[in-house]
């Protein structure tokens, strides 16, 4: 369900290629005022990266949720997200959940591997759903609290996005009344959908409760497009501002796969997402 299958390998390969070829990565970090931030989630000390436009603000802000990869902070993922949103006037905060990169706590994939080894795949699937909606979500919301404390952030214009496990996190957070104005889940549950009936039910429930605009996005060759076919119509039925898009099969093949191949494929969805967010948070509330 959560192991490094072909889709994840493609993402990691995309991150590696981007790391090798993005000569402007370090320059972008400075240009986007990148800061390493530590913060608490319960008793754990977590780490995140904060990016902001020049000037005092107040700016709209985006919380970016990474996937299940062990070391999201060691790739160009966050800098690439910043390269899309900071020039458009957004603060970006990328909290790293427990066990990822330099954040304290147990890595979720290690916990799931152990549960599956001891109790089987069904138990692993149930644990994944429970962790995603409890401790993992707690970590995201602790990151959101960091954003809300920044004096240069307009707390009336907060949005959330993320890919894969991060897409699931985005939907679960959108269900909560925590202050987000819009949500952009990308490749949400595409790798978990077929093998986890509990997660399918949980996400259907979440979608039925979401009251903020959602833009649900999938690449054309994602691991599974059934989430778009199941969750999409319900979203569109509930709110005329909601959007669902499976992108056309264009461009390099790896950018048509899970999470658009990672950092190198973010340009595929960037302009669509910015246009969607402009409609929702383009003016101060």
Indicate residue ranges for each PLM-predicted region.
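Short substrate-entry loop that stabilizes the transition state in hydrolases
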Residues: 57-59, 67-104, 192-193, 224-225
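Alpha/beta-hydrolase active-site loop
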Residues: 110-150
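Short glycine-enriched nucleophile-adjacent loop
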Residues: 167-178
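Alpha/beta-hydrolase fold nucleophile elbow
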Residues: 152-164
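Alpha/beta-hydrolase
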Residues: 65, 95-97, 186, 247
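C-terminal catalytic histidine-bearing segment of alpha/beta-hydrolase fold enzymes
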Residues: 241-285
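N-terminal cap/lid segment of alpha/beta-hydrolase-fold proteins
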Residues: 25-57
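The feature captures the conserved acid-bearing segment of alpha/beta-hydrolase catalytic domains
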Residues: 182, 188-243
